[in-house]
């Protein structure tokens, strides 16, 4: 669900409305990169029985370095929480006319209720709720394409990598931040560790025997899980951009979620616009646990401090409500929150590639040379993109 949060919606919708099909290639590339990265994260948790923050916490010996690393990881997790609350507030405003600040508070209360379901009723009850929300999200964001299909020539042309000024680079960074999501890298390694954890604490060397299932079999199943999840998420994210490119390009005011909603309502009817708003609301609620879970795991792994998920959620509501209360444009805040995520990706990705390449840590399951090369290329590309973005911003380009 991390790949279908309001940050994805804002980034893809704005990119399609402003640049048409220009950044289709970024969505596709981001999805391919996310597949590799999330599989490596899951593999690390399965093979070692530890999360990425745990492994880094044991390997970063200087306390100030460990705290600095924790701070940047905590900021990207908090940026995700901010996006969820703002997206839910905008959706409630579009659907029911609720003021943004009150909508943010309502979204926060509902997200806390969902976390209670997860903690008290177990993962299965929470997964049932999330699957239902996923169906709503997919329907809400793909319905418009049936009423106004995209231009096939434009879609194919959008697969050619290129930019058009600083704003397109900013949106590309936002799309990649929303797609790859560094906090999801931390969280997925922990989720895979917990999902396949044996009943009793076990040393890494004895995990396979304690589980009673071969590690290669678990890794094959994980590859399928990641493939299916990202195929669904990638399709929906691409649908959002194509919907905007086909219907909103050149229309005044459609570089905001509110403007996009109004244009969809005027051009395709109230049903499509309502489905869009419902999908936006569902995306904020469905991804509510990811940022809180990732932040808790980051703090425990790096600082060895445990904070209850609900307490974390209450704390992270503050910056989101402050943004809404100050009247900052919510779409701009959403897009910039995803840019923050893009700057956090290398800090999660580079250690992930290094650790999953080590024979002493993963043994026979370490990365193949081609996999490591792909991870290095992804890291270099993301660092270069962020460097170009900074240069354009500070040079006035």
Q: Each PLM stretch: what is its role?
A:
Residues 33-42, 64-84, 92-118, 177-178, ...:
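Helix-loop-helix module between adjacent transmembrane segments
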Residues 35-47, 192-207, 211, 231-259:
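Extracellular/periplasmic helix-exit of transmembrane alpha-helices
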Residues 11-16, 39-65, 117-122, 251-265, ...:
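Flexible loop linkers connecting adjacent transmembrane helices
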Residues 68-74, 95-117, 135-140, 306-322, ...:
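Transmembrane alpha-helical segments of multi-pass small-molecule transport proteins
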Residues 106-107, 118-144, 163, 340-341, ...:
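Membrane-interface loop-to-helix entry segments
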Residues 63-66, 101-104, 228, 271-273, ...:
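Loop-to-transmembrane helix boundary motifs in multi-pass membrane proteins
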Residues 14-39, 53-58, 102-103:
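Extracellular loop-to-transmembrane helix junctions
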Residues 134-160, 169-190, 352-360, 385-396:
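Hydrophobic alpha-helical segments and their helix-loop junctions in multi-pass secondary transporters
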């Amino acid at each position: 669900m991390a790949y279908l949060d309001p940050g994805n919606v804002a980034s893809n919708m704005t990119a399609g409305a402003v640049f048409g099909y220009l950044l289709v290639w970024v969505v596709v590339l981001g999805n391919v990169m996310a597949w590799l990265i999330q599989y490596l994260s899951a593999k690390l948790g399965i093979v070692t029985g530890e999360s990425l923050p745990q492994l880094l916490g044991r390997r970063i010996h200087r306390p100030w370095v460990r705290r600095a690393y924790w701070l940047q990881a905590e900021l990207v997790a908090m940026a995700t929480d901010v996006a969820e609350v703002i997206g839910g507030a905008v959706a409630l405003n579009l659907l029911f006319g609720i003021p943004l600040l009150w909508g943010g508070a309502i979204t926060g209360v509902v997200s806390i209720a969902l976390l209670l379901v997860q903690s008290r009723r177990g993962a299965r009850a929470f997964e049932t709720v999330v699957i239902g929300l996923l169906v709503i999200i997919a329907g809400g964001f793909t319905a418009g394409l049936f009423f106004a299909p995209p231009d096939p020539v434009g879609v194919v042309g959008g697969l050619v990598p290129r930019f058009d000024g600083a704003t397109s680079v900013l949106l590309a960074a936002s799309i990649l931040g929303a797609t790859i999501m560094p906090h999801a890298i931390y969280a997925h390694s922990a989720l895979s560790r917990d999902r396949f954890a044996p009943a009793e604490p076990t040393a890494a060397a004895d995990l396979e025997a304690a589980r009673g299932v071969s590690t290669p079999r678990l890794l094959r199943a994980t590859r399928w899980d990641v493939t299916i999840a990202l195929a669904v998420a990638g399709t929906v994210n691409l649908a959002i951009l194509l919907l905007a490119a086909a219907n909103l390009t050149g229309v005044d005011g459609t570089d905001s979620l509110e403007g996009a909603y109004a244009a969809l309502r005027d051009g395709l009817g109230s049903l499509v616009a309502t489905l869009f708003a419902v999908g936006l609301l569902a995306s904020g609620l469905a991804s509510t646990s990811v940022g809180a879970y990732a932040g808790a795991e980051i703090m425990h792994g790096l600082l060895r401090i445990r904070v209850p998920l609900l307490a974390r959620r209450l704390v992270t509501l503050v910056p989101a409500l402050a943004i809404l209360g100050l009247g900052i444009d919510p779409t701009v805040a959403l897009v910039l929150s995803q840019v923050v995520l893009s700057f956090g990706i290398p800090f999660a990705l580079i250690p992930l590639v290094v650790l999953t390449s080590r024979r002493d840590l993963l043994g026979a399951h370490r990365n193949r040379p081609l996999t490591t090369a792909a991870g290095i290329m992804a890291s270099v590309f993301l660092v270069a993109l962020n460097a170009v973005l900074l240069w354009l911003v500070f040079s006035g380009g």
